[in-house]
């Protein structure tokens, strides 16, 4: 295999990257953690479009299921000490270099989120690093994890009509890491914090609730579940 490294763009404080399927072709999104743009690239590294020029503070981006013109992203998470105005936004393509950006939900200190699908429904899992602070580097107010059923159509949401969130778990200091894990064919969220590693399992149906399993009880920054040794069990 021959690999060639090349510079495709200059982006100060480049932080977040996400795959994006558009017109049947693989693309990828790149955004920054500070006040900087978000760009859409072809799989070959050609810069195709500017999605936004500001405000930045992007920790996470994910395409909306079933949409080739829409994704969700965090905005205004600049640092643990400067993220009280953090939120999740909806980016919808209206034309070339023409993207509409609307607020889906204000979620102070939101660091990670994920969209999980189960039995034809999509769920938003929202992970907030902490729940407040009174001074710099204040970690006395632990983070929380929220969830919401994600409607098929997001056109009705904006800053004055936000998606309601339901608290799933609090007391999560340094609620930092998130990854998606297929558990026997079910998409689940793996969330990490000082209290350990927790697996969030979406409802099986309308009558069921979320399941939360603690997988580990020591402080963890980030985690990925994988069957490394081939024994059929994740490590």
Predicted features and spans:
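Beta-propeller-forming repeat regions
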Residues: 1-235
């Amino acid at each position: 295999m021959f690999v060639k490294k090349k510079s495709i763009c200059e982006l100060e404080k480049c932080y977040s990257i996400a795959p994006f399927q558009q017109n049947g072709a693989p693309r990828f999104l790149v955004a920054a953690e500070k006040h900087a743009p978000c760009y859409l690239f072809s799989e070959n590294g050609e810069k195709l479009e500017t999605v936004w020029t500001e405000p930045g503070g992007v920790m996470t981006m994910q395409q909306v299921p079933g949409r080739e013109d829409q994704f969700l992203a965090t905005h205004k998470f600049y640092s643990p000490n400067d993220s009280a105005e953090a939120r999740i936004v909806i980016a919808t393509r209206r034309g070339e270099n023409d993207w509409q950006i609307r607020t889906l939900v204000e979620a102070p200190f939101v660091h990670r989120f994920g969209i999980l699908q189960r039995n034809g429904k999509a769920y938003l899992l929202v992970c907030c690093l902490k729940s407040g602070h009174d001074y710099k580097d204040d970690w006395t107010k632990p983070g929380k994890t929220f969830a919401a059923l994600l409607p098929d159509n997001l056109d009705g949401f904006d800053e004055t009509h936000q998606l309601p969130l339901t608290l799933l778990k609090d007391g999560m200091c340094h609620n930092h890491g998130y990854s998606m894990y297929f558990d026997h064919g079910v998409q689940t969220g793996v969330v990490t914090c000082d209290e350990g590693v927790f697996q969030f399992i979406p409802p099986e149906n309308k009558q069921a609730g979320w399941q939360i399993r603690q997988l580990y009880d020591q402080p963890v920054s980030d985690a990925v579940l994988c069957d490394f040794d081939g024994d059929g069990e994740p490590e």
